């Protein structure tokens, strides 16, 4: 199974042999490597302990393997931390008055808890997730896969893998390089003649690289 297919199926649908194969890549990632990376992160919402748990959970959702980098490599936890630190995290833009209907694929999460609370409560449910063996981590995520927290975690992991780096994730354009996305290129005319007849694909460029401008975090991420 390709990793692109994995991210669109629920954890409960995975068989035992596949779970073992997904466990192997994380076993090869030294935990000290993750700890060292987190030690230098400019966290705005998570505590260091929470960031370790979220990083480990995101890596289970999108693990590093022979096909490419994982959530840890892409700095997904930074993306999530920035989102939760800003107005999105406190539900500034979502209608939050009861009564609340059932959540659905069409309407999304329906409930009183804002994203910050969903994460804080979800992290408590996961316990010492970052120190668990991989098989136990998978079991822990299977136990919560029907919850709003897991739906949010999974969505945020994918967003952090493939967003523009200005938002905090997709470090070194690792997500775009993996899928061959060139970034927000505005015009290909200059390349047509130079590469006519070739199976050519431009190297990915971020919004800042394309425009030559520096961008500050937008209002959603400033808090």
Language-model regions, residue ranges each:
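C-terminal segment of N-terminal export signals and the immediately downstream linker at the start
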Residues: 17-56
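Short amphipathic alpha-helical interaction patches enriched in hydrophobic/aromatic residues
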Residues: 61, 65-66
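Short, mixed-charge, low-aromatic patches
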Residues: 8, 12-13, 31-38, 81
